[in-house]
Amino acid sequence: MKELKIGFLQQHNTADTKDNLLRLGEGIRDLAKRGAQLIVLQELHNSLYFCQTENVNNFDLAEPIPGPSTSFFGELAQKFGVVIVASLFEKRAPGLYHNTAVVLEKDGQIAGIYRKMHIPDDPAYYEKFYFTPGDLGFHPIETSVGKLGVLVCWDQWYPEAARLMALQGAEMLIYPTAIGYESSDTPEEQQRQRMAWQTVQRGHAVANGLPVITVNRVGYEPDPSGLTNGIQFWGTSFVAGPQGELIYEASTDEEESIIVEMDLDHSEQVRRWWPFLRDRRIDKYTDILKRYID
């Protein structure tokens, strides 16, 4: 049995980035002392979700990798002997920015990065204004706790991303996330969206025989422009097993610091029962490369 203790922080952020980092640091210390070996943080955890508006001043939030945040989280990873999945606004070059997940190894070094591939552009989620689509492809990151299939938020709606990670030996799928309710939606529509979001990811777990770890932010963040009523981030961070079973589900409206124990060897048993990778008809899937089959 290959046991892994996975910790995550579901946090409400404010405009005070120093306070956000302070609380993240305290949360990481607490999780590490409770035995976490892998700690996953939410998407763009250093700041408010600034993509509600298109504002060039928000580019000042970006930083290089390596940079201040990788140093901060790397020191914590080394001090406590944990692997950390962080999510940063990367300044790659003047005028070139990415939404980037960074994995810090137990020795504090960068094990690898993943640049978000699918970039949304919806009301209150104006990410195309800020982020260039990733160019590193879908490749698991090798760490001392396993091969991590790290993706980011909007990627979670695309089965292709999860499949490509699985086909390259990922032992789990990890999604740092920032998603919430659109202010004008009815309660019924809000519930449908939240359930669809979780269901599609649990489907990735089933289809690939892999656990899924998704960490979302929580709480209300106002729209700085005043054009909308802001976003109520719905939390619901969760861990699902390789059959899609819910192992843990967080609150929709509270911060949480949780450790979940996972048996990574269970994926092998599930894939023996459900050999989906064996039965794929790879000779018949060429049309998947087309935008649409007319």
Describe the function of each predicted region.
Residues F138-Q168, T177, S267-D294:
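Cysteine/selenocysteine-centered motifs that mediate thiol-based redox chemistry or coordinate metal-sulfur cofactors
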Residues V103-A111, A240-I247:
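Short, glycine-anchored, charge-dense loop/turn motifs used at functional sites
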Residues T17, E26-K106, I113, I179-L210:
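Cys-nucleophile CN-hydrolase/nitrilase-fold catalytic domain and related Cys-dependent amidase chemistry
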Residues E3-A15, N20, T100, I113, ...:
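Active-site-proximal beta-strand elements of phosphoester/diester hydrolases
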Residues K116-Y130, E254-R271:
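A short, polar/charged loop-to-alpha-helix boundary motif
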Residues A62-V85, K147, C153-E256:
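CN hydrolase (nitrilase-like) catalytic-core segments centered on the catalytic cysteine
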Residues T100, I113-K116, E249-S251, I259:
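Residue-level detector of high-confidence beta-strand sites
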Residues A86-L88, T100-V103, H139, S237-V239, ...:
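Short beta-strand scaffold segments in enzyme catalytic cores
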